[in-house]
């Protein structure tokens, strides 16, 4: 019962935070006249439908990655199940924790051995971080910094700019550490991390870091046997999943704000998701809604329309996972109980 109550609280907390921010934004920015000017026609409906299709593409990309990285040992149904459970855990935990760490638990439940599942978890983590590292120079080659961060000349604009570069530098360092730990010197990196987190002010994470250090060694031994074809498919699936997630907002802008530059909309999604990797709230609740309306406001003529797009975006990319996960978790727990009794 306590576990059920804890899960219910973790599910309702991000919803409450998100709704509180939405109510505040509605009270301060929503104008019914702007809402009435939105043309609810076939064009709008088709564009919203495209946004849902792009989100399905995101899940297909992640499921494809689980399939290829497990050498097709996971069926499509199992891969989609693991994907949705990962998305649910991401939705109810701070984005700094994320759902990737639990993917090994979900894969293990579907028949992948614990050691192998740990290896695959480390690889997916590395691929996601590497995507951000590589995409940054590409984005800034296509869209100048003045356009990405020129939406506000005050403290909000400069704050987002500095926060982005701070987070991006952190991602680069973390990715380099993962690369060295997985591909180059896993034992040395593991020893260094273990010693570092024995320091008094870092000791609270010592146990977690010890687990990561051990996973790096295990992953390094497993990865050496992998072919370029395996890596190419995993990279393609990673790119598909992230690009599809970005394109959700492009489709929503086509629905509600056709005058905005689609390239700028796409590029700003990279900034948004980079910042959300360090959100302290579950699934970025509250932070996402505010950040979206503030950051995209200059591309939309009416603040009310920006709020409508933000809400649609969060429903498609977040709240649907809370609902789906809440439906899937009970059967997943029952399956674990049955497996335990069989043993």
Feature map (PLM): residue ranges:
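Transmembrane helix-loop-helix hairpins in multi-pass inner-membrane proteins
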Residues: 1-37, 89-201, 281, 285-343
């Amino acid at each position: 019962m306590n576990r059920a109550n804890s899960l219910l609280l973790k599910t309702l907390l991000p919803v409450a935070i998100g709704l509180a921010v939405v109510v505040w934004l509605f009270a301060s920015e929503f104008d019914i006249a702007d809402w009435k000017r939105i043309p609810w026609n076939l064009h709008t409906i088709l564009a919203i439908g495209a946004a849902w299709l792009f989100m399905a593409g995101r899940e297909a990309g992640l499921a494809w990655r689980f399939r290829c990285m497990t050498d097709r040992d996971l069926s499509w149904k199992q891969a989609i199940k693991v994907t949705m459970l990962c998305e649910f855990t991401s939705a109810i935990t701070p984005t700094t924790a994320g759902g990737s760490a639990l993917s090994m638990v979900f894969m293990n439940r579907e028949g992948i051995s614990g050691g192998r599942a740990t290896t695959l978890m480390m690889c997916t983590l590395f691929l996601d971080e590497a995507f951000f590292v590589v995409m940054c120079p590409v984005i800034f080659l296509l869209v100048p910094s003045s356009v990405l961060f020129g939406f506000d000349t005050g403290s909000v604009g400069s704050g987002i700019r500095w926060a982005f570069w701070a987070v991006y530098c952190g991602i680069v360092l973390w990715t380099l550490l993962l690369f060295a730990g997985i591909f180059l010197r896993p034992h040395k990196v593991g020893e260094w991390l273990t010693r570092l987190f024995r320091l008094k002010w870092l000791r609270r994470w010592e146990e977690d870091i010890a687990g990561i250090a051990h996973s790096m060694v295990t992953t390094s031994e497993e990865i050496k046997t992998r072919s370029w074809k395996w890596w190419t498919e995993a990279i393609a699936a990673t790119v598909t999943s992230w690009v599809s997630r970005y394109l959700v907002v492009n489709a929503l802008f086509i629905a509600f704000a056709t005058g905005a530059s689609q390239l700028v909309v796409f590029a700003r999604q990279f900034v948004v998701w980079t910042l959300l990797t360090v959100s302290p709230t579950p699934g970025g609740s509250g932070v996402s809604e505010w950040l979206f309306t503030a950051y995209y406001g200059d591309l939309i003529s009416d603040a009310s329309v920006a709020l409508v797009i933000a809400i649609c975006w969060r429903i498609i990319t977040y709240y649907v996972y809370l609902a789906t996960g809440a439906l899937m978790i009970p059967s997943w727990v029952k399956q674990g109980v049955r497996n335990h009794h069989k043993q």
